[in-house]
Design a protein with these regions (language model features):
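Membrane-embedded alpha-helical segments that form the functional core of polytopic membrane enzymes
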Residues: 52-97, 107, 131-135, 139, ...
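Membrane-interface helix starts
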Residues: 41-51
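Small-residue-rich segments of transmembrane alpha-helices in multi-pass membrane proteins
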Residues: 49-59, 173-188, 233-236, 240, ...
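Cytosolic, membrane-interface loops and tails of multi-pass inner-membrane proteins
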Residues: 9-36, 91-118, 212-235, 288-298
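Intramembrane alpha-helical segments
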Residues: 33, 37-38, 108-198, 283-292
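Helix-loop junctions at the membrane-solvent interface of multi-pass transporters
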Residues: 60, 64, 139-141, 162, ...
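Extended hydrophobic alpha-helices typical of membrane-associated regions
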Residues: 29-34, 249-251, 255-323
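Multi-pass membrane catalytic core of lipid/isoprenoid biosynthesis enzymes
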Residues: 76-83, 99-149, 224-273, 308, ...
Length: 323
């Protein structure tokens, strides 16, 4: 693939303010590519993990119902590649639509578009390139998964605008970010049913939990420029709402597992799978007990910890599938 055109000479080459210092993009990527990789959030991989993990949940739970197959290894790898590419394309789209807002927020004004490192046209070309490669991965899956992958474009397209018209943009993020639970289930089974739908709803509740924490970083700037979020909506009641999302995450995931595995699964397989919501719930409780919604550094640290929480749940589901 021909690399995108170099960023304008007048662009600011510095890293994005909320990226980890010394990340691989800053250290290893060719200078011409850094603004594009920053657009894709390659310097902040936690978002890719949060997009990928529901895919692995869906695949592992599907495999636990009828046994894993060698083809599942490709589905898992294909989901990883697709998550990296589509998270990059989605973030590029988000930055294109939000560039005027981002220029007014301290945490985001150093991003490539508002800082002038990349032009809107260059960003659009980069977005199309990422989506095109992701499509090549998608077409290796079965027909049901391909249709679901195409349908996923709708919530991805709508999400950046949600903060303009609703106090619940995190719901739209959850709809988009957890779509992989449906897609990966369909890639294994060839269809859908109640178990993946319940798992999908569990993922949406999880997203409401972690992205409300994330949104507390920007609540003061968001109030000044009129951006809506659950962090602003909940205010001092954030802890109670997060507790509700925690309970919903655990109960819906447990319901998905029971719907998928009963009555045929062995007790050991069932108990091992149920360790997934149990472990995830304990981690979310740990986050809730340590949350200081007025400390951006704490909010960012807790948000990032959801990668580990989600992966532990995925490991329990994968172990149940391998029994």
């Amino acid at each position: 693939m021909t690399p995108p055109p170099p960023a304008p000479e007048s662009s600011t080459p510095g890293p994005v303010s909320d990226a980890v210092r010394g990340n691989w993009v800053d250290r290893l990527a060719p200078p011409w590519s850094r603004p594009y990789l920053r657009l894709s959030r390659a310097d902040r991989p936690v978002g890719t993990w949060l997009l990928l993990i529901p895919c692995w949940w869906g695949l592992a739970l599907a495999a636990a119902t009828d046994g894993w197959r060698w083809a599942d290894l490709w589905i898992a790898l294909g989901c990883a590649a697709g998550a990296w590419l589509m998270r990059g394309a989605g973030c590029t789209w988000n930055d294109l639509t939000d560039r005027d807002f981002d220029a007014q927020v301290a945490r985001t004004r150093s991003r490539p578009l508002p800082s002038g490192q990349v032009t809107p046209r260059q960003a659009a070309v980069w977005m199309a390139a990422q989506a095109g490669v992701a499509a090549l991965v998608l077409v290796t899956f079965n027909g049901a998964a391909i249709l679901l992958g195409i349908a996923a474009l709708a919530p991805v397209a709508v999400y950046p605008f949600a903060k303009r018209f609703t106090w619940w943009p995190q719901v739209f993020l959850g709809i988009a970010f957890n779509w992989g639970a449906l897609l990966a289930w369909a890639a294994h089974t060839g269809g859908l049913g109640w178990p993946p739908v319940l798992l999908y709803l569990s993922g949406i509740a999880w997203t409401l939990f972690y992205d409300t924490i994330y949104a507390h970083q920007d609540k003061e700037d968001d109030a000044l420029i009129g951006v809506k979020s659950t962090a602003r909506l909940f205010g001092a009641q954030t802890g109670r709402w997060l507790a509700l999302f925690l309970v919903l995450t655990v109960l819906l995931m447990a319901a998905a597992i029971l719907a998928a595995l009963l009555p045929d699964a062995s007790p050991v397989r069932l108990l091992l799978a149920l360790c997934a919501p149990w472990a995830l719930g304990w981690h979310l409780l740990w986050q809730l007990r340590r949350l200081d919604a007025d400390d951006p550094a704490t909010c960012l640290r807790l948000f990032r910890s959801n990668r580990d929480a989600g992966l532990v749940a995925a490991l329990f589901l994968a172990a149940a599938a391998c029994l």
